[in-house]
Amino acid sequence: VELYLEDTQVQDLSPIRGMPLEKFYLSRTPVRDLSALEGMPLVELNAVECPIGDISGIAKSPIQMLWLTGCPVEDISALRTLPLVSVTLHRTKVKNLGPLTGTALQRLHIAETPVTDLSPLKGIPLTRLVFTPANITTGIEVARALPLQEIGTRFDESSKDLQSPAAFWTAYDAAVRSSTK
């Protein structure tokens, strides 16, 4: 079962509590509270540009694909036990990736976030990483060791710069060398 409420003025999700939703799209709505989603069989949740700060309501859902671009969320501990495949935290306030440690995550978008440490990603089978290299102070070697197929700094509707890890790291290393001269 799918429900699309994108670009509506819906604020209160309590009327859908208990529905057997598997895909839920509520991007660009004024929704702040996800508690009504607790226990739903959600596999996909798209909540781009919503004022959601607390995602604890999805902690018991089997979410595999999650988009939170532009949400003011900071704490992602609710993601710790989810069977995630793809997570987009682009332009969120997330700083700590620790809750993702040990997951089977394949795609992660953390560009334009305050994340500075990639160490929690060690051992995760990521095939795509989108991030802001200039923000990273710890764990860049962890990113180099990931089994990536694509890596970049932008991946949204307006722009994509994904490339092979070999091409990305060659350009990254050249930029680092030129900045230390």
PLM regions with names:
Residues 1-11, 15-95, 99-116, 120-180:
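Concave beta-strand-loop units of leucine-rich repeat
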